[in-house]
Amino acid sequence: RDGKKDGGNLLTSSMYYPYRMLVTLSTFEPETMRSLFRRLLDEQRPLPLRYEEFRDGCEECRERFQKSDPDHQKANSHYQDLRAISVYLTFEYPEKYFLYKYQMFKQFSDLLGLSSMRQTTKGEKAESALISYNKMCETIVDAVRKDPELQAMSKARLDENCYPDPEFHLLTMDIIYF
């Protein structure tokens, strides 16, 4: 499948290949990856645990892939970081999750004088960054919900081909990004 078509630059950009590695690993071990996604998308389980298990499982699969063939030696990363995982969660549950990009988080936090975290993709710091980011986004969404004029402006820009964004999560992303 075409990563640009499915997620634009969310999963593919310069030197960032989570979509390509996801397809590669899913082709190599489809049941492993299917199981990892089922656990990632299981809302009954805590998000930090799901995040950690998904990353660890992708790393184990990547290692098996790399060892399976000398031609696979360049597969040094699975690229399944906070950004990629936020895309998967947001695509599945768009009314609950937000698209995460570290630079957007840092720049917006700095603009507001909030403390932002160093970029990280592993362990408690990554989980803490995701929780902090989601809290910041929820604060913005709360303000958007109190502003009917902003809501109307946002809805007016969407046509029938657009996701209707009933919870204003994409509008929140626009506010953070721009």
Q: Which residue ranges define each predicted feature?
A:
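An N-terminal alpha-helical hairpin/helix-loop-helix interaction module that forms a charged
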Residues: R1-H78, P94-F178
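Contiguous, well-ordered alpha-helical segments that form the cores/surfaces of helical PPI scaffolds
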Residues: A84-E92, K106
